[in-house]
Amino acid sequence: MSKEKFERTKPHVNVGTIGHVDHGKTTLTAAITTVLSKHYGGAARAFDQIDNAPEEKARGITINTSHVEYDTPTRHYAHVDCPGHADYVKNMITGAAQMDGAILVVAATDGPMPQTREHILLGRQVGVPYIIVFLNKCDMVDDEELLELVEMEVRELLSQYDFPGDDTPIIRGSALKALEGEAQWEEKILELANALDTYIPEPERAIDQPFLLPIEDVFSISGRGTVVTGRVERGIIRTGDEVEIVGIKETAKTTVTGVEMFRKLLDEGRAGENIGALLRGTKREEIERGQVLAKPGSITPHTDFESEVYVLSKEEGGRHTPFFKGYRPQFYFRTTDVTGTIELPEGVEMVMPGDNIKMTVSLIHPIAMDQGLRFAIREGGRTVGAGVVAKIIK
């Protein structure tokens, strides 16, 4: 029993495989679980168990994803693998599987291909912080110079999208041979695991980040003042803390004079908890759903941003027709809808259901946001798209 308890104290890190179709992402995923379970314990997963990915719904979007888990001596990894290219696009944009780092699989026999580039770009847009490269199928390439050339191409491609191409770990291996148990190739999987352990820093837990609470409801309690409720997204709020009310209106400062949960007064509210926060001197009409309470200076309100968007297909309950420039839907951030206008990239006249597209959005009210914030695009309460803030303009 004590061993089980010990395992749970290991840091949890979320990773995933990305890369071009048929370059060996799923085979590598199977090889990692197999080799690591042999060396460090845990469950091995066969290729076909991973390849028959179950359908999931994230924000109404159908995504096929496989989740596997494995351990190294120092960490516990949750790893996502998607069977199809469209699944990757949806997964990365909706943040259904947030990645602390990604393993980019490139077949040495092909070198970088169109989806290799697209996944790196998406990784940059949606805020995947670290990429490690697994150069696969190296057992099929005898020419050392060719391997060096492919490696150089991959490094250049990463640098093009602002990843540190020159410093990125590249492991040369063969997922298939490792899966078949050949010692020299198994060694490469252990090398990859070591790169994950050392190159991807331990993710900062939500509770250690600056306090943020999306406001869901506002009440006036006679004799006590104004209470806002919501689920603490990150950080800790303590009685007596000064906070800012950010978004929609001018940013205002106030002090939290009480934190309550299930009608009980507490000293603090923590990430993941549903709380009510009593605010000193704030009037009921000065605050509304859609704003956030945040640690002063930790987040700012913005109206204009670049985003990466996936437009739901008709089958997913999305639009049946394309939209054009001048489209004015609602953008749903955290707890509220804000109307916005869009600009499409040069040369793009229309966007079809099922497309993913880069678009510039201009909202009619500012919303508290930072890069990587997810949102939904809605028309009259119906979700027609999902997006992520890639870059703040103003």
From Swiss-Prot:
GTP binds at residues 19-26, 81-85, 136-139. Residues 10-204 form the tr-type G domain. InterPro entries: EF-Tu_GTP-bd, EF-Tu_GTPase, EFTu-like_2, EFTU_2, G_TR_CS, P-loop_NTPase, Small_GTP-bd, T_Tr_GTP-bd_dom. GO terms for cellular component: cytosol. Transmembrane segments: none annotated. One of its GO terms (molecular function) is guanosine tetraphosphate binding. It catalyses: GTP + H2O = GDP + phosphate + H(+). Residues 81-84 are annotated as: G3. Keywords: Cytoplasm, Elongation factor, GTP-binding, Hydrolase, Magnesium, Metal-binding, Nucleotide-binding, Protein biosynthesis. Its EC number is 3.6.5.3. The keyword Protein biosynthesis applies. Mg(2+) binds at residue 26. Residues 136-139 are annotated as: G4. Residues 19-26 are annotated as: G1. Monomer. GTP hydrolase that promotes the GTP-dependent binding of aminoacyl-tRNA to the A-site of ribosomes during protein biosynthesis. This is Elongation factor Tu. The lineage of its organism: Bacteria, Pseudomonadati, Pseudomonadota, Gammaproteobacteria, Pasteurellales.
